């Protein structure tokens, strides 16, 4: 109600660079695997509104430049398109697949790397600063305690999905620059190869790129 009555206050705070996001509320939802849970960070109504506005603008500018092999968190894209990539690769003789697993992807996004990538195209420092504030927003636990955060982009808000695609588009472009075929849905990705030896080389080199260039962590136990 306050937002509706005083929209100018919110606008002026954003323009002046004085807007401060509230802590996100941590909650858990069960995963398909029994006993496993996914942590979400739920923003306030006002923060969700601001995040959604930022996400819409980012999507407008970035989405047209994304790889055609990226299918998650995008308008007019769906999981079935990733399946079509797999079928098409199989038809063309690709019999080996590197299944890359990024360990706790959303929870481990490096803030400095994210800001660096955004700054390549966004020249308004106020926008970069506001996004950085959302990335660093405190986390309120169920017991009322508040935790500081120096990495990660909490799932549960409208901004994290587009930021994830902006970051991982660097990976898409690297794979394509090497002449490789792949398909990605959010942080789930497969790379297609024609021989076992090629798959092993690709797995090693792409793992190195992910960890050294994007500062993410590959789960070696699940990557195969």
Model feature map: region roles:
Residues 34, 59-63, 140:
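Short connector loops/turns at beta-strand edges and beta->alpha or beta->beta junctions
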Residues 6-9, 13-28, 65-69, 73-77, ...:
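Conserved polymerase palm-domain catalytic core
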Residues 21-37, 42-43, 47:
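Conserved beta-strand/loop block within the catalytic cores
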Residues 1-4:
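Non-catalytic, polymerase-adjacent accessory regions of viral genome-replication enzymes
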Residues 35-40, 63-66, 97:
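Short small-residue beta-strand/loop micro-motif enriched in glycine and branched aliphatics
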Residues 40-57, 64:
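Hydrophobic alpha-helical hairpins/lids featuring a short glycine-rich hinge
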């Amino acid at each position: 109600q306050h937002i509706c009555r005083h929209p100018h206050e919110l606008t002026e705070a954003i323009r002046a660079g004085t807007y401060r996001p509230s802590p996100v509320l941590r909650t858990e939802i069960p995963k398909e695997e029994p006993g496993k849970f996914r942590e979400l960070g739920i923003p306030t109504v006002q923060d969700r509104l601001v995040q959604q506005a930022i996400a819409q603008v980012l999507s407008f500018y970035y989405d047209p430049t994304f790889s055609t092999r990226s299918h998650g968190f995008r308008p007019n894209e769906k999981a079935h398109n990733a399946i079509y990539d797999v079928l098409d690769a199989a038809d063309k003789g690709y019999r080996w697949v590197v299944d890359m697993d990024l360990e706790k992807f959303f929870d481990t996004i490096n803030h400095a790397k994210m800001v660096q990538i955004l700054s390549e195209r966004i020249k308004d420092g106020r926008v970069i600063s506001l996004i950085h504030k959302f990335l660093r927003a405190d986390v309120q636990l169920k017991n009322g305690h508040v935790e500081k955060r120096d990495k990660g982009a909490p799932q549960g808000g409208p901004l994290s999905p587009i930021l994830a695609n902006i970051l991982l588009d660097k990976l898409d472009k690297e794979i394509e620059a090497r002449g490789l075929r792949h398909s990605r849905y959010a942080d789930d990705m497969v790379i297609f190869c024609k021989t076992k030896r090629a798959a092993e080389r690709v797995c090693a080199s792409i793992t190195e790129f992910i960890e050294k260039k994007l500062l993410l962590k590959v789960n070696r136990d699940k990557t195969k």
